[in-house]
Amino acid sequence: MKLIDSLLERNSARGLIEPFPNSDEMEKIYQAALRAPDHAKLKPARFIQISGQGLNKLSSVFYDFAKNELMIEDESILQKYKDAPFRAPMIIILVTKHQEHPKVPLIEQKLSTAASAQNILLALESYGYAGIWRTGKFSFDNKLLKYLNLDDNSTILGYLYVGTRDGDKKKISNYSVDEFVSVWE
């Protein structure tokens, strides 16, 4: 399959099962991630890869954070957060490590991490795997940083849930480019 065809067919996979990429595949996937646009070569993207028993640890982090920081008392909601990491056999937490630079503001560093995430999703597809980028309360609350042993110069941009697509890839129609593109000539 040509690269353009793969790009045109890519979509997020909600249902993910084993297998997930092995360490050799992940090495190449991360190399692809690090090829993302990066003003001044700051390499702000950081990745926390979680699988196996690590999912249990993340489950505890989510539960503790929801209970202690979000002040959630409803056990059914707490259980939902506790179960969240088990929706995929691997999770990659997307982190931007901020660095002071006179020409590269924080937003550019976050955008570089986001581009790295897209490269990861595309590289996963090239190996026959799939993923979905999830965000929410556990992405945008800086109080979670301490639960993940991250410093205050870090921002969580989301979580890539990774594995093998469970079921067929959904078919998505192409969009009319005219709705999104204006041309100046």
Listing of model-derived features with the role each one plays in the protein:
Residues 3-12, 157-185:
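C-terminal helix-cap and adjacent tail motif
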Residues 33, 92, 98, 102-146:
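Small-aliphatic-rich amphipathic alpha-helix that forms the alpha element of a beta-alpha
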Residues 43-44, 88, 156, 177:
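A generic structural signal for well-ordered coil/turn residues at beta-strand boundaries
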Residues 52-54, 97-98, 164-167:
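Short loop segments at secondary-structure junctions
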Residues 67, 86-99:
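Acidic-glycine-rich active-site phosphate/pyrophosphate-binding loop
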Residues 144-155:
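Short, electropositive alpha-helical surface patch
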